[in-house]
Regions:
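Short amphipathic helix-loop junctions that connect adjacent transmembrane helices
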Residues: 1-13
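Helix-to-loop junctions at the C-terminal end of transmembrane segments
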Residues: 26-39, 126
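Cytoplasmic membrane-interface "Motif A"-like loop-to-helix N-cap segments
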Residues: 36-48
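C-terminal ends and interior cores of transmembrane alpha-helices
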Residues: 49-63
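Intracellular juxtamembrane helix-capping segments at the cytosolic ends
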Residues: 82-96
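Loop-to-transmembrane helix entry/capping segments in MFS-fold secondary transporters
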Residues: 97-107
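A membrane-interface helix-boundary motif in multi-pass transporters
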Residues: 124-142
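Multi-pass alpha-helical transporter architecture, strongest
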Residues: 139-169
Length: 178
């Protein structure tokens, strides 16, 4: 928000609205895409889009065309939706029925730890080098997220046999263990 105001001379509310509106529009289509190509590939595509958005945003200035700025904020929103819609279901797919809570705890611990640490680290970098390091910093870490996703071997979509698909009395474990 401070970056948008001080560096880009944009209303930070508008930049967030653009990103959030794009994410909201993307949530359902992203779910359908993941159903076709898989969650891992969809997340990787989202990480690439987010890295591109952050990488391009690192070169934006107050003199950059508003359309380009808005496009990057929209791309970031779509990318974030692409990642978020698929991440938690992947975690649930990794867990057996009784371990869903444990895996949910791991997921949120890692996610929240990053949300606590990165403002401090990026803040230190911005204090030392200026606000212009924010988007390159973000691009580097989203690029690293891409690398870590390459090592993910499980948690993608599982086909549910047709005879089980309509059975509402079955547990998640019964549906996923053939």
């Amino acid at each position: 928000s401070v970056y948008a105001s001080n560096i880009l001379h944009k209303d930070y509310n508008l930049t967030l609205i653009i990103a959030q509106a794009a994410a909201i529009v993307a949530y359902l289509p992203v779910g359908f895409v993941a159903g076709r190509i898989g969650r891992k590939k969809t997340i990787l595509a989202g990480v690439v889009m987010l890295t591109v958005a952050f990488g391009v945003a690192g070169f934006l200035t107050a003199d950059s065309p508003s359309a380009l700025m808005n496009a990057m904020f929209a791309l970031a929103g779509i990318a974030w939706a692409t990642i978020n819609v698929n991440s938690f279901p992947m975690v649930v797919e990794l867990a057996s029925g009784g371990d869903v809570g444990k895996y949910t705890g791991f997921y949120y611990t890692a996610s929240m730890a990053a949300q606590v640490a990165t403002p401090m680290v990026s803040g230190l970098l911005m204090d030392k080098f200026g606000m212009h390091v924010l988007f390159p910093y973000a691009a580097v870490f989203t690029g690293l997220a891409f690398v870590t996703m390459l090592f993910v071997k499980h948690g993608d979509n599982r086909d549910i046999p047709a005879e089980k698909a309509g059975d509402t009395d079955m547990t998640v474990e019964e549906l996923t263990n053939d």
